[in-house]
């Protein structure tokens, strides 16, 4: 099973979180990440964040990335959205 944990942070506090699960073995890792991020954005009522080169590098290194104001087209009322892969398919 693939699980992604998404958290919204504001003023140093986590104000909202969710875990998205994906059991579709036909999808590769990248598609699972984008699918989970899409579900997160729907649940949190956010526009999809833009992946900058720095976000991609951070995610490749740590399986975790933060999306701040620069990553969203719309105005956001929090400091950042953090996503982290917490379980991967074997």
Task: Indicate where each model-derived feature is located.
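A structural signal for the main folded, soluble domain(s) of proteins
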Residues: 1-3, 22-23, 75
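Amphipathic beta-strand/beta-sheet edge segments enriched in Tyr/Trp
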Residues: 4-6, 11-13
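Short, flexible N-terminal segments of the mature chain
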Residues: 14-43
């Amino acid at each position: 099973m693939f699980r992604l944990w998404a958290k919204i942070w504001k003023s140093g506090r986590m104000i909202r979180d969710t875990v998205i699960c994906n059991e579709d073995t036909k999808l590769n890792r990248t598609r699972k990440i984008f699918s989970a991020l899409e579900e997160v954005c729907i649940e949190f009522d956010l526009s999809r964040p833009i992946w900058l080169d720095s976000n991609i590098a951070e995610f490749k290194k740590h399986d975790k990335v933060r999306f701040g104001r620069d990553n969203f087209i719309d105005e956001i009322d929090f400091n950042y959205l953090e996503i982290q892969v917490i379980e991967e398919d074997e």
